[in-house]
Amino acid sequence: MATLCRPAIAVPEHVITMQQTLDLARETHAGHPQRDLVLRLIRNTGVQTRHLVQPIDETLRHPGFEVRNRVYEAEAKARVPDVVRRALAHAETEAAEIDLIVYVSCTGFMMPSLTAWIINTMGFRPETRQLPIAQLGCAAGGAAINRAHDFCRAYPGSNVLIVSCEFCSLCYQPTDIGVGSLLSNGLFGDALSAAVVRGQGGTGMRLERNGSHLVPDTEDWISYAVRDTGFHFLLDKRVPGTMEMLAPVLQDLVDLHGWSVPDMDFFIVHAGGPRILDDLCHFLNLPPEMFRYSRATLTERGNIASSVVFDALARLFDDGGAAEAAQGLIAGFGPGITAEVAVGSWAKHGLPADDVRDLDALELTGGVALSG
């Protein structure tokens, strides 16, 4: 089965703290009639630090969509190779062994996709398939994992490289002064990530089942208005309450797989804001500790769009990984309103869960397998 291996993460060197964000909001929007509400909402995000691809002074300027998109392309080409090389190393594989590259980004536009540049410059085969995903927003991390899983099921033994590049700060619009826009200015950060899904072998989450769900008639809740000045992010005030609708989707996929949510060992979910995590705890009846990796990503990086799930998963790896055969779930949420969900078990060097249990039994009994 396909195994999602350890992700590689990178964040730009320019950092802005919550206090700096609050100070900027006070100064820039001194006369805003709802300034106090905006400041309170920014504090409530819990986002302590964010990373930006440009210094804050440059971020706050708007030189035009053309210039910003040139910055996007230049910075992506400068920074993506590092996470790609590290992800390949984590998965103990090489560029020539990759059969599909999935590239996800909603914060800049290139045609051809960056996948073509990656293939041409980093030693990938010309036959490598390309799958750019540009319009699923924050759900794209989960979607990339699921499409990689689907590909490995369709072509057994294949390997997939996922690359996420999100420079959310390049979408800052100084003329957007609605409460939702000002909140977003204090929530989103920049990051890059990459991970390999191996068709055989590897250590990580063995992908066993995936699913997608679109909440009917919510397509205007999270959206872009594409104007001369670029992408204008629109966020409906109803978005924070979407987990009441999406928690049952997670529950149903776990049930369909024959597992039980209370018995799950780890959850890696898109942390678009603190209420998402709080509501998942409530509606799934889970302790906050189950979402600690996603919470840490939100606190230290902000909402980094499609890279959130990879950053949170990397934190699980940094923590020593899950126990052998541990049951887990990954979920991305984004425009649509869309949920992309995967369930699977932790694999030791790609061993199936039953083989891992047999290996543990051998270790515990000095090499003699226990039988029923």
State where each predicted segment sits.
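Short, well-ordered amphipathic alpha-helical segments that serve as non-catalytic structural scaffolds
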Residues: V53, E75-A91, R147, L192, ...
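Short beta-strand segments
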Residues: R6-A8, V104, A134, L161-E166, ...
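Short coil/turn connectors at secondary-structure junctions
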Residues: M1-A2, A95-D99, P126-R129, Y155-V160, ...
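Condensing-enzyme catalytic core mediating Claisen C-C bond formation in acyl metabolism
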Residues: M1-A74, P174-E244, P248, D252, ...
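Conserved beta-ketoacyl condensing-enzyme motif
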Residues: T45-F124, Q130-Q135, V261-L277
